Amino acid sequence: MAATAAALAVTDELALPLRAVGDLAAAAGVSREEVVVITQCASLGGKLPFDDASVGSVLAVIKKVENLGDLFITEISRVLKAGGMVLIQSSPSDQDPNNSIQRKLLLGGFVDVQASAASSQDSEHSVTIKAKKVSWSMGSSFPLKKATKGLPKIQIDDDSELIDEDSLLTEDDLKKPELPVVGDCEVGATRKACKNCTCGRAEAEEKVEKLNLTSEQINNPQSACGNCGLGDAFRCGTCPYRGLPAFKPGEKIALPGNFLAADL
């Protein structure tokens, strides 16, 4: 059994034209003397006398397509080196042989299967099927490159100017707020209620205005007739204290909480 061969030419006929051998040598890039020729390959029982992956290129000139069975395609793949080329020439007299051969090559694991007219001038071998063995060996492994996902980069424009927050403040914003004086409403008997009064002075003044009385008349009530402090039953029609509760002279009149409420 031959160990290796630059190129191998096989045929199921008794002889192989020299032109076909030359075509294989030219396609394989070797000299004609480096091509090993095997005739009547059908008698080999589908076996080729070569080691595994020991042949660079194979040319098969097959007259009968039935001689190119699946077993023979597998044998060609066995002796071919990884990435090796195979050329198959068949007779055009067979019914659409190229499609059948292409299908067998594809099922046999070959790639880049193409059909073209043969360069040989032999009219009996005018259809050429070209294919290529895969460049990797069965059982070989290689690492897969995992895509690394990086964090998105934030583009920071150093030329951009930052706004000073203090520049957004006005002069009024910078002024110190004036706090209200605690208990200011209670200072002095003649003080008026402030705008946002919460101590009750505003309500008291509203009651006084309704009665048309002065603060002095409320805080220190006096009666010329002596009946004003006894109640409405003893007051005259022009009494300024009419409608107020009874009181003692000189004591502050206590107005009820519902004094301003409307009578139903």
From Swiss-Prot:
Instruction: Kindly give the HAMAP family that the UniProt entry links to this protein.
Output: Anamorsin (MF_03115)
The record's listing under InterPro entries reads:
Anamorsin, CIAPIN1, SAM-dependent_MTases_sf
Q: Report the source organism.
A: Oryza sativa subsp. indica (Rice)
Location in or out of the cell = Cytoplasm; Mitochondrion intermembrane space
Give the required cofactors. Answer: [2Fe-2S] cluster; [4Fe-4S] cluster
Q: What does this protein do?
A: Component of the cytosolic iron-sulfur (Fe-S) protein assembly (CIA) machinery. Required for the maturation of extramitochondrial Fe-S proteins. Part of an electron transfer chain functioning in an early step of cytosolic Fe-S biogenesis, facilitating the de novo assembly of a [4Fe-4S] cluster on the cytosolic Fe-S scaffold complex. Electrons are transferred from NADPH via a FAD- and FMN-containing diflavin oxidoreductase.
Residues forming the motif Cx2C motif 1 are 225-228
Q: Which family is this protein grouped under?
A: Belongs to the anamorsin family.
Q: Where is this region: Linker?
A: 143-174
Protein name stated in the entry: Anamorsin homolog 2
Gene Ontology MF: a single term: 2 iron, 2 sulfur cluster binding
